[in-house]
């Protein structure tokens, strides 16, 4: 029997390496791939929201919105979304923070197409066949942090300066999608910036700032 919608509220965080909690310093040192749960924005948000909430992490490094990576299989967000929704339901809120990996040079996508990928995920959430006792969750679209310009000096990077430019353009396109689809919106680039270590991934301070901002959004939606 499906769990009813009781007092406990559940938030699904669907994203890429910055939801997984990729640790750029630990990776550079070769001793840790992931921040501890209490450092990741998902873990910090769990603490801020308190015992009446359950935060479900669904972050995967390299995940795209709707595209198959030609070099590494299994990274298409659309291909993983239904399983994530089904296993975590009932849900009160779904946070989608994807798009950075769509900016890779192998895709060459403009900001508008990346935003359409996010829109496809939003529509998939809305159309998901929720079990009895579940109603459609609210949706938060998060435009990802900018890619740092230092990426130009990274050897064999999957990103280039065009990727940096697109990372500065997607927030406008994401906001349009959020308005059209009736979703909440947060521009993470206004809150946090990538680590100077690899110019892509968040520092612990960035995770904390993002957690505080998203906790406010989630609580606000719960009160509606």
Where are each of the predicted segments found?
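Generic structural signal for helix capping and beta-alpha/helix-loop junctions
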Residues: 21, 63-65, 149, 195
